[in-house]
Structures are given as C-alpha cells and as structure tokens.
Amino acid sequence: MKGFDPRFTDLPDYIIKITREIWEDRGLATLHHYYAPDIPVRMPSGLSVGNRATIDGTLATLAEFPDREILAEDVIWSGDEDAGFLSSHRIVTTATHTGNGVFGPATGRSFTVRAIADCAAKGNVIYDEWLIRDAGGIVRQLGMEPETFARDQIAREGGAVRPFHPDHDIAGGYLSRGNDNEWGARLADILTRIMDKDFTVIRAEYDRAVRTEHAGGQGGWSWGHAETAW
C-alpha cells in the first residue's frame, strides 16, 4: 500500500496490527505517528480532538482494565491508495475490572462486549475516527445498572459531559460517502426499514438461526430476539 509501512499487507492487516500494537502490546507512543496530531474522535459521550487526548484515554483505560484484549471480528473497507481508505473494525473486547477509574472502584469482575471503530487512513496515518462501544454492557457485567451508573457519574464529575451531536462536530478530513457496494446498499436498506418500524424485513432477510448482538450486552438467537431488541 502506497505510503504505508511495508509490513502491512492490506488495510485490514494495518488496522488489526496497529490496534494490537497500541492496546495489547502497550505501544501508546506509536499513537504519535499512527494518529494525526489533530484527529477528531467522535463517540456517543462526546468529541475528542488530538492524539494526545487518545493517549490519555488509553492510559486511563489500561489502568482500570490492564488485561484488556481486543479481538478483531471483521474489518470492512473502501477507498484506495490515492484517495485514502475508510475502514470499519468490529471488535470483541474482554477485560477484568482490577483498577479504579471511570467505572468506579475495582470490582474484580470481567466483561465481554463489542465495539466498532470507523477510521479514515492515508499514508500510514489515521486522521478521522468514529467510535462506539457498548458501555451499557460493561456496566451491567460489572454489577451495576446503566441509569444508576450514569447518575452517579454525573454527581462525581459535577455535571454531565455534553454527548456528541452534529452541531458541535468539526471537519476531520474525510469527505466521502462510502461507495455503491451491493452488500452495503442491501444492509443500509435493511436498517432503514427497521428504523421505519418495518419489522417484516427481519424474517425476510435474516436467517432463522441468526445470532444478534444489541446494546447493553444483550445477545440472542433467531427472529424473536432481533425483533424484540429493536
């Protein structure tokens, strides 16, 4: 790949390897060259700007969950060497809560949840990111209820951090709109129909033995769970 370290064979290989290098191999300093200095990272909890903010957040998470593992389930991508790439990395993350931190005093409990990181990359550098993690699933597996945890967190921090909203977004450099891949278009159509409450699409498009995972660590089998969770 033009502009990328030759040890990476393709974009999924790049995404998976640097994720492990940063998190599991403790290569936090590599964020200075893998992440752009002014990268915006958009999360439900707000907007973070700059690789230093990402380094600080990573340090805090590792202090709270030192045995955290990030297991790559899949990486899908679009783009090319000249225009740059967009990746979507679906992750299973496991950890044990052995340190004090954002999730309160150490509980000694473990969790397994999913996360998805969408990253725009060019020339060996990630310059724009969107990240969502199942925080509700973490909270529940640590023995708390999400609403109670959120209220306690607001009280501890002296007020709520404003959640991410397009009104306070900033330009990160990625201006494309994906592509016209037939499978992406099909998924977009399924999700649009579900969000429009056309749940007939689930039985029409999902296998009867489908396994679905939803926010809050709620996983289940077949059409009934998929319909109920939505």
What do the predicted segments below correspond to?
Residues 1-230:
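C-terminal and inter-domain tail/linker signature
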